[in-house]
Amino acid sequence: MTESIKGARLEELIAEQPWAGLIEEARRAMQHAYVPYSRFKVGAAALVDDGRVVSGCNVENGSYGLTLCAECGLVSALHASGGGRLTHFVCVDGQGSVLMPCGRCRQLLHEHGGDQLQLLTVSGLRTMDQVLPDAFVL
């Protein structure tokens, strides 16, 4: 499952389900990002084990440490709409290009999707275990 998504392969993956729908939803969420300081919009979308799609966008704060990543909004939407486990995830930047979640968000996603959560990343399709080996677990 370590496919490269450079060039043509990226276009193939983006056209496949569930990725096509998730990327579209992440791009839609990204349009609502509140980024008056960095101007760096991020949108995220995920498929839930019951078939729902949840999404989120980043929300900045003048005190940068209080900024909420798009993944935080996504997890909040997950629980506000009934909970469940994430099965597939993608996030995009302001141009709609695929991004890798930051370290904090990888830990957050692991909590709500586990080791086998599928992620579409800049380096291909990956499991959460591949992008966050030895995740912290209580």
Per-range role (PLM):
Residues 39-48:
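Short beta-strand scaffold segments in enzyme catalytic cores
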Residues 72-81:
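Feature captures the catalytic cores and cofactor-binding loops of soluble hydro-lyases/lyases
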Residues 34-37:
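Short Gly/Pro-enriched turn/cap motifs at secondary-structure boundaries
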Residues 47-49, 58-59:
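Histidine- and/or cysteine-centered catalytic micro-motif in compact active-site loops
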Residues 2-32, 81-138:
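C-terminal binding/interaction regions
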Residues 57-72:
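Compact, glycine-rich, soluble single-domain proteins
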